[in-house]
Regions:
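Secreted, luminal/periplasmic, and some membrane-associated catalytic domains
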Residues: 6-10, 27, 41-47, 53, ...
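Acidic, His- and aromatic-enriched active-site or binding-groove loops in soluble protein domains
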Residues: 130-159, 220-228, 262-281
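Short, structured active-site-proximal loop/turn typified by the sulfatase FGly-forming signature C/S-X-P-X-R
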Residues: 25-69, 112-114
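His/Asp/Glu-rich, glycine-adjacent segments
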Residues: 65-213
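Short glycine-enriched, charge-decorated loop/helix-capping segments at active-site entrances
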Residues: 214-219
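Secondary-structure boundary elements
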Residues: 105-110, 188-196, 228-243, 271
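Structural motif
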Residues: 14-16, 197-201, 245
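Active-site-proximal N-terminal segment of extracellular/periplasmic enzymes that hydrolyze or transfer
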Residues: 1-42
Length: 282
């Protein structure tokens, strides 16, 4: 959106369209392309965090620090005390360093942030947060659900939007439904709370880029789908005079040679292999 001379845009929304690269701008993404090439839009290249993984990239964006500084060196890590691997942990306290919204609060005490499905979103200092969080029963049963802050937000938003389509967020059935629900949750929060900063995670494109590869013709369908979801959000926020920023965590490219570290480690005799249900585990 183009603001007049001297006119300020006091609020912003950041749409994290995972996997989006400059090469995707074009006929399959007309609305994202229009934003990037509009007077209000300024297209910039970002050197991705290393390693190029969701948790590391997001923590880098939100702290302005490198993984070696904020401590999120991957989507998981090996705990040498417990001798266990820990993946996709949720506590925001794992991210070392001041978060973007905390920095902004030093200048504006009433600054409010909504963090929607960006990771490390439990026990966060963000004012409004929603994140995937299954419920685990005493009988071992697992129920798909979300966690929110404030806690009562979870009941209200599920009442209005329905259950979060968890199977379309992770796993073999991952698809556009989860990004659509997240986009609707961003509208819901904006209409009721008008945060100064909204962080919105839209993962759909990344699914098919990893599932099929970046040059597969089916990527065109994924591009059109996420362009529609993101485009509707762009229109919605611009109509409310909220500045729209679109970014990506990393890009997916073709590889010429595959390396399998665990196979090489096993060949060298560096791994202890355990049989579980007929499968090899470390």
């Amino acid at each position: 959106m183009n603001y007049g001379e001297g006119e300020q845009c006091p609020r912003a929304v950041v749409l994290n369209v995972v996997g989006l690269c400059r090469r995707h701008l074009g006929p399959d993404t007309p609305r994202l392309t229009s934003l990037a090439r509009s007077k209000a839009g300024r297209e910039r290249l970002i050197r991705p965090a290393f390693p190029a993984l969701t948790c590391s990239a997001q923590a880098t964006y939100l702290t302005g620090k490198t993984p070696s500084e904020h401590g999120i060196v991957g989507n998981g890590w090996y705990d040498r005390t417990l001798n266990e691997h820990h993946f996709w942990k949720q506590s925001n306290q794992l991210v070392q360093g001041e978060k973007l919204w905390e920095s902004l609060r030093r200048d504006r005490k009433d600054f409010r942030c909504a963090k929607l499905f960006w990771w490390y979103n439990m026990y966060s200092s963000a004012d409004y947060s929603i994140t995937p969080r299954p419920l685990y029963g005493s009988d071992g049963n697992k129920v798909f659900d979300v966690h929110s802050q404030p806690l009562e937000l979870r009941h209200k938003i599920k009442r209005d939007l329905g259950e979060f389509p968890f199977p379309s967020f992770w796993g073999p059935t991952a698809g556009i439904d989860s990004s659509q629900w997240i986009a609707e949750s961003a509208r819901w929060i904006e209409e009721r709370h008008q945060p100064d900063l909204s962080l919105v995670y839209l993962p759909h494109l990344d699914y098919d880029l990893q599932r099929f590869g970046p040059n597969d013709p089916r990527i065109k369908t994924a591009l059109r789908a996420i362009d529609e979801v993101a485009g509707d959000l762009i229109d919605f926020f611009e109509e409310r005079r909220v500045r729209v920023i679109v970014l990506s965590e990393y890009g997916i490219t073709e590889v010429r040679r595959t390396i399998h570290p665990n196979r090489e480690f096993r060949h060298q005799g560096w791994l202890n292999i355990k049989d579980e249900f007929g499968l090899d585990t470390l």
